[in-house]
Amino acid sequence: MPRLWPWVLLGLVALEGARGKKRFRPLTYPRITNKTFIGQYVDIHNRLRSEVQPPAADMLHMTWDLALARTARAWGQKCIFQHNHFTKIKGAGHPDPNLHPVGENIWFGHARRVPFNSSNAIYSWYSDKDFYDYQDNSCSQVCRRYKQVVRASTYKVGCAVVFCRRLDRHRNTEYFVCNYGPTDTYPSRPYKTGQPCSACPEGDTCQDYLCRNSSRDKIYIKRYSRWYPPWEHRLICDDSCIVLAVLRPSLTLLAFVVVYCLQKRYPDLMLQTETV
């Protein structure tokens, strides 16, 4: 027994040290389906797209996409500040081939105990316009983030924000990821310049200097409700799965209770099998 005292003291010291060093606890971040969160970043994207200089003749209006948001969340939860290489694989970033290839922008900041605001990230991406020359289609510094925000052919966006205890060498960060579909892998200009909406696809209408189409702008929920990025390895359990998971142990427990009660009530009761 006396030999245990050193270990007990060591455990108490470790416990006291753990109490002394409190871990940072951030606010709860919005879910990818949070309407306020979605409305904020979609509206900012569309406003910035409508204000490009020189003006865009073929800039499409953006709407939210569930599958892209799930891809953004899955990558963000890995807490790796690099671009998602899976989006280059057909079907790995979005199930709809018409939205391939999938584009991406990433941002991180120090986590704070205030509600997350996506405008800081999106404006930082858009500020890359200072390094972009439209006439020469050249960048004096990195400007791919700006070109992705104002890519005219992109009409779907989905974003996610997650808390990372450690992101590379940084601690306690909020990691914001946006995925876009479709993007353009060619080093072309992000849009055609000209009178706003003068080069919209046939059948489109013009609203706030952006090309709109009710079919293209439709938001699909049920279509992608069962889709998750195949590289996420997410454990998925639908309603029937949940019922089975709850029902099976409940019935097993009930059977055990019934047998136990019968044996207590009728101690001489024997379950026999007929032999031939």
Segments and roles (model prediction):
Residues 2-276:
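Mature extracellular or exoplasmic CAP/SCP-family domains and secreted bioactive peptides
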